Regions:
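Catalytic-domain carbohydrate-binding cleft regions of carbohydrate-active enzymes
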Residues: 1-391, 397, 404, 413-417, ...
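Short, Gly/Pro- and small/polar-rich lid/capping loops
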Residues: 462-474
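Short, hydrophobic/aromatic-rich segments at coil-to-beta transitions
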Residues: 473-477, 543
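Short, hydrophobic/aromatic-enriched beta-strand segments in well-ordered soluble domains
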Residues: 454-463
Length: 543
C-alpha cells in the first residue's frame, strides 16, 4: 500500500426485494435493470467497479436471465462486478435467530463460492433498521472481517460512533466497521475537496488511520449509479499520480482486507471501538411489532427448522434414515428470503405478505415432514418391550433437560381412563383432556434429557391417575411446588411468593400491563412508533 491517504469509493445499487412493490416487479424489472445498466457502464468506463449483495438476487438472475447471468460472471472474473454482503438475503438482523443469521451467511457465501469462486468477508447492510449487539460476534464466528452501513445517519439511538473502527460483540469478538459512508443514493460531484470527506480524514488521523469509505449509487430499485458519478470517480482516479490523496474504485469489502492484511497489531489496536448495540430510533421500534403474524410464523419456522435438523442428524447418525439436506436447505432459504429488512419488519405493501405468509406455511410443513419422518424412524428403533400399554416416544430437541406437559392422541380407548408410566415403572401425573369417536387425547408430564428421547407407557385403566399434584387453581390464586401467585380484582399480579425461599415476597407492588402512548405517524403510518415514548414506563391499566 502507498503512504497516501485513501478514499475507497464503493459503487452500489441498493435493491429492496420488496417494499412498496411486490416480488414479481423486482424479478421482471429491477433485477434486469441492475444487470443491463451496469453492463453499459462497464463498457464505457474501464475503472468502474460495482458491488451488489444477496445471493438470492443472483439466483434470480441465474433463473430468469441466464444469458445476462453468464455475461455478469465474466465481469466478476475481471474483478469489476463484486459480490458482497456474504449473505443469501439482505435481511433484518434483530428479529431472526442467531442460527438463521448463520444460515443466511452460510447460504450466501456458499453460493458465491460455488458459482463464482468468490467469497465476501463483510456484512453489507446499507439499509436496515438497527443492528443488535450479537451481530459482530456472529460475523466474527462466521470468519467475516467487516460490517458496513449508512443507516445510522438516519437516526441512531447512540449517534454515529466513528467513521471506521472496530465493533466489539457480546462475547468480546470484533469485526471492523464502516458506519459513516454517506448515503448510497448519492451522485458524487466532489471528493478530495469535499468537506465531508476532509472532516472524516482529519478525524481519522487521531487513530493513525489514513483512509475513509464513501458510497455512491442508487436505490431502492436496483439499477446502477448515475453515469456522471461514475465518470467523476474515473476522472478523480486519473489524478492519483499528482495528488496526495488516492481515490480507489473499490469493492465493498476491500477496505477490510487492507486493514486486516496491512495494519500492524499496534495500528489495529488504535482503531476506535464500539462496545454496544447499534439500534435505530426510526422504523425500528414499530418494525418489531408491525404485521406480527409474520413474525410469529418466522419464529415457528426457526423452531421447527432447529428441531427437524437435530432429529434428522440423529436418525442419520444412527443409520436409520438418510439426512435430507436438500429439503431442509430449501425450506430454510424459502423463509430466510422473507427476513429481508422490509419484509419481516412489516414495512411493505399488503400484497407482499400474501406471498410471505404462504411461504412460511410451506416451509413449516416441510420441516414438520422431516421431523415426523426422522422421529418415526427413531421411534421404530426404541426399546419398548417394557410397555404394558401403548408406547409413546417423547423427543426433547433443546440443549437442556426439560420437564413439560405433553399431549398425545390414542385410539381404541373408548370411555376408559388412561394412566401413564415412565421407563422405570413409576406412574406420572396424567389426565384425559378430550374424547372423540376416533381418539382419546391425554396430557402428561414428561421429563427428558437434553437432545434426548424417552419412552412412556400409556395404559388403559378402569380408574384415573391418582398421582398427587402440587398444583391448585382458584378464582384469583395459583399455586405449585415453587410459587403462589395471587391476582387482584383488576387482574393485576398482586403477589408472587417463592415457597423455596422461605415464602419470600418477590413483588414490591402489583404488576400490571403497561399502555404505550401512540400518536401515529403521518409519514410511515403502518409501522412507525416513537422511540422516546417507548423508552418511558408504560401508563398503568385504569383502575
Amino acid at each position: 500500500m502507498s503512504n497516501k491517504k485513501k478514499i475507497y469509493t464503493v459503487a452500489t445499487a441498493h435493491l429492496d426485494t420488496v417494499w412498496s412493490w411486490d416480488f414479481e416487479t423486482t424479478v421482471s424489472k429491477y433485477i434486469y435493470n441492475t444487470l443491463v445498466d451496469n453492463f453499459k457502464l462497464f463498457k464505457k468506463y474501464p475503472t468502474y467497479t460495482f458491488s451488489f449483495e444477496g445471493s438470492y438476487r443472483y439466483e434470480l438472475m441465474e433463473e430468469y436471465y441466464p444469458e445476462l447471468f453468464d455475461k455478469m460472471k465474466e465481469y466478476i472474473k475481471e474483478g469489476r462486478w463484486n459480490v458482497c454482503g456474504s449473505s443469501f438475503e439482505n435481511g433484518d438482523v434483530n428479529i431472526p435467530s442467531p442460527e438463521a443469521l448463520f444460515r443466511n451467511i452460510l447460504f450466501g457465501n456458499s453460493y458465491f463460492d460455488k458459482k463464482f469462486g468468490k467469497r465476501s468477508v463483510d456484512i453489507y447492510l446499507p439499509d436496515c433498521f438497527g443492528f443488535g449487539w450479537a451481530l459482530p460476534s456472529i460475523a466474527s464466528h462466521a470468519n467475516l472481517l467487516g460490517f458496513t452501513t449508512q443507516k445510522l445517519a438516519w437516526g441512531s439511538a447512540y449517534g454515529v460512533p466513528f467513521d471506521i473502527g472496530r465493533w466489539r460483540g457480546v462475547d468480546g469478538n470484533e469485526i471492523y466497521a464502516s458506519v459513516n459512508p454517506h448515503d448510497y443514493y448519492f451522485t458524487l460531484k466532489k471528493l478530495r475537496d469535499w468537506d465531508f470527506v476532509q472532516n472524516k480524514l482529519k478525524e481519522n488521523e487521531k487513530y493513525d488511520l489514513d483512509m475513509t469509505y464513501i458510497f455512491h449509487g442508487i436505490g431502492d430499485r436496483g439499477g446502477a449509479p448515475k453515469e456522471k458519478s461514475v465518470k467523476f470517480v474515473e476522472e478523480e482516479i486519473s489524478k492519483n499520480n499528482s495528488s496526495d490523496i488516492e481515490v480507489l474504485a473499490s469493492s465493498a469489502d476491500r477496505i477490510y482486507h487492507d486493514i486486516d492484511e496491512n495494519f500492524t497489531p499496534e495500528q489495529k489496536a488504535k482503531l476506535p471501538v464500539w462496545n454496544n448495540e447499534l439500534v435505530m430510533k426510526d422504523h425500528a421500534v414499530g418494525g418489531y411489532t408491525s404485521r406480527a403474524v409474520g413474525k410469529r410464523w418466522n419464529r415457528r419456522c426457526q423452531e421447527l427448522a432447529d428441531i427437524a435438523e437435530r432429529a434428522s442428524v440423529t436418525a442419520s447418525y444412527l443409520g436409520i434414515k438418510e439426512y435430507n439436506k436438500s429439503a431442509i436447505d430449501i425450506a430454510w432459504k424459502r423463509f430466510i428470503a422473507h427476513q429481508f429488512h422490509d419484509d419481516i419488519p412489516g414495512t411493505s405493501c399488503q400484497r407482499v405478505y400474501k406471498r410471505s405468509w404462504n411461504d412460511y406455511a410451506v416451509s413449516m410443513n416441510q420441516f414438520a415432514n422431516e421431523l415426523e419422518a426422522s422421529a418415526s424412524a427413531l421411534a421404530l428403533n426404541m426399546k419398548t418391550d417394557f410397555c404394558k400399554g401403548t408406547p409413546i416416544m417423547v423427543y426433547n430437541p433443546i440443549e437442556s433437560q426439560r420437564q413439560q406437559t405433553v399431549t398425545a392422541r390414542l385410539s381404541g380407548i373408548g370411555n376408559k381412563n388412561v394412566r401413564v408410566f415412565d421407563d422405570d415403572g413409576n406412574e406420572i401425573k396424567s389426565q384425559v383432556i378430550n374424547r372423540t369417536n376416533t381418539y382419546t387425547e391425554i396430557l402428561f408430564i414428561a421429563d427428558v434429557k437434553s437432545l434426548g428421547t424417552r419412552i412412556y407407557d400409556a395404559r388403559v385403566s378402569d380408574i384415573p391417575c391418582n398421582a398427587e399434584s402440587a398444583v391448585s387453581i382458584s378464582k384469583n390464586r395459583m399455586e405449585n411446588q415453587k410459587y403462589i401467585v395471587t391476582l387482584n380484582p383488576n387482574g393485576d399480579i398482586e403477589s408472587i411468593i417463592d415457597k423455596e425461599q422461605n415464602n419470600f415476597q418477590i413483588l414490591k407492588e402489583p404488576v400490571s400491563l403497561g399502555l404505550l402512548k401512540y400518536n401515529g405517524s403521518r409519514v410511515w403510518p403502518a409501522w412507525e412508533m416513537n422511540y422516546n415514548e417507548n423508552k418511558k414506563c408504560g401508563r398503568q391499566n385504569p383502575r
